[in-house]
């Protein structure tokens, strides 16, 4: 789901040593993590579109580094101010002492808001001439209409939910708060989120599911969705049907038509699990990785012969189910191990030609491919390939299945 940003947080910084952009970004993420819980985790906020990409400009002079940072924010004023204060608290970049100071928080909507206000005044003025207007009555009507679709909190765990989770005989289970908001937007009010649980499913949800006539698990079309379903079942949550977003897509970003299509294509749980098991068995029959074995990556124009070192083949076999990725240089030397959700911001921060190969337990998307092409990355090996409209000529892409079945 994409949001229009409301504010630009602008800060200046000084570091008592020579550092790069990646060092500054790493310090910001590392030193603000868990300060105020997951709700204000910068990576989570970026994943949900509530914060934009952190822009860093660095200059070095006399053995020191200084520069400016811009953090686009779609949070409210109080939350945006809190993010600014969190970043100001960063006092180390790498081994060096540092100082971060807020320059300003710019309201990038200000001019647009002024025009809207002036236009609203004109509309109200002309409307008043035509008909006597009780403005309090209008406000009350609008307020009542909005409250119908407002998100609620359910149970002692305060799970994000729609207003009808108690009274509707059917229940839709999704992963997170953003998924609930999106379904509410299109009129689905019997929805509740597990809030991304991957080790402990809330007891409230387990009990609620057993009270319902029909329970649908509606999950993202990626490996994360697979893990959530596994946890739901292992915690004895009643699931009757499984619906999935298209491969590589998230429930929170689907349109009304896409949501309706996904739900209409839902499968009974037993049928869905049988389908998954058959797919896993087909892959398991071919789990053989030979040392230095050439792997073919086919495109519509050519067949590229690729040789993978034995240690890379071993690494690929370890990755499924970890939601992790590995970045390598041109000689297959390890650069960094990262979480799948951090791959794009990490690549954005690296200089061109720094990373040559990426192996990760995730979906290869158009956005990742475009960025890889821009950064001159040679090859990406992922768990699956998502909806790709255009394949860059300079990037080879493979899946784990391509490797282990060769």
From Swiss-Prot:
EC annotation from Swiss-Prot or TrEMBL: 2.7.7.101
Main EC class the enzyme belongs to: transferase
Temperature note: Optimum temperature is 70 degrees Celsius.
Effect after changing residue 175 to Q: Strong decrease of primase activity
InterPro entries hit by this protein: DnaG_primase, Primase_DnaG_arc, TOPRIM_DnaG/twinkle, TOPRIM_dom
The protein's role, per its UniProt record: RNA polymerase that catalyzes the synthesis of short RNA molecules used as primers for DNA polymerase during DNA replication. Can use NTPs but not dNTPs. Binds DNA. Also part of the exosome, which is a complex involved in RNA degradation. Acts as a poly(A)-binding protein that enhances the interaction between heteromeric, adenine-rich transcripts and the exosome.
Subunit description: Forms a ternary complex with MCM helicase and DNA. Component of the archaeal exosome complex. Interacts with Csl4 but not with Rrp4.
Protein name listed in UniProt: DNA primase DnaG
Species, as recorded: Saccharolobus solfataricus (strain ATCC 35092 / DSM 1617 / JCM 11322 / P2) (Sulfolobus solfataricus)
């Amino acid at each position: 789901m994409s949001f229009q940003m409301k504010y630009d947080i602008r800060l200046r910084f000084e570091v008592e040593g020579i550092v790069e952009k990646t060092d500054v970004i790493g310090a910001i993420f590392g030193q603000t993590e868990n300060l105020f819980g997951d709700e204000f985790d910068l990576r989570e906020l970026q994943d949900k579109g509530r914060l934009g990409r952190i822009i860093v400009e660095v200059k070095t002079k006399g053995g020191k580094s200084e520069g400016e940072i811009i953090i686009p924010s779609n949070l409210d004023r109080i939350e945006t101010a809190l993010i600014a204060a969190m970043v100001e608290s960063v006092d180390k970049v790498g081994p060096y002492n540092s100082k971060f100071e807020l320059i300003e928080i710019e309201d990038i909507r200000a001019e647009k808001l002024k025009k809207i206000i002036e236009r609203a005044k004109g509309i109200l003025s002309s409307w008043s001439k035509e008909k006597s207007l009780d403005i309090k009555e209008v406000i009350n009507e609008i307020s009542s209409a909005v409250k119908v679709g407002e998100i609620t909190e359910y149970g002692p765990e305060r799970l994000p939910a729609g207003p009808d989770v108690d009274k509707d005989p059917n229940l839709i289970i999704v992963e997170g708060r953003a998924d609930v908001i999106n379904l509410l937007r299109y009129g689905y009010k019997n929805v509740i989120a597990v809030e991304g649980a991957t080790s402990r499913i809330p007891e409230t949800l387990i009990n609620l599911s057993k009270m319902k006539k029909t329970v649908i698990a509606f999950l993202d079309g990626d490996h994360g969705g697979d893990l959530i379903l596994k946890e739901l079942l292992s915690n004895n949550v009643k699931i009757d049907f499984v619906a999935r977003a298209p491969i590589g897509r998230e429930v929170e970003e689907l349109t009304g038509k896409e949501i309706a299509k996904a739900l209409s294509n839902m499968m009974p749980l037993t049928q869905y699990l049988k389908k998954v098991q058959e797919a896993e068995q087909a892959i398991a029959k071919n789990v053989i990785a030979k040392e230095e074995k050439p792997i073919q990556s086919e495109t519509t124009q050519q067949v590229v012969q690729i040789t993978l070192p034995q240690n890379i083949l071993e690494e690929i076999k370890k990755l499924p189910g970890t939601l992790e990725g590995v970045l390598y240089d041109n000689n297959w030397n390890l650069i960094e191990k990262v979480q799948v959700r951090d791959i794009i911001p990490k690549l954005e921060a690296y200089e061109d030609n720094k990373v040559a190969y990426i192996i990760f337990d995730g979906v290869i998307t158009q956005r990742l491919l475009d960025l890889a092409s821009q950064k001159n990355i040679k090859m990406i090996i992922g768990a699956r390939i998502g909806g790709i409209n255009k394949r860059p000529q300079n990037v080879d892409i493979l899946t784990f299945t391509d490797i282990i079945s060769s």
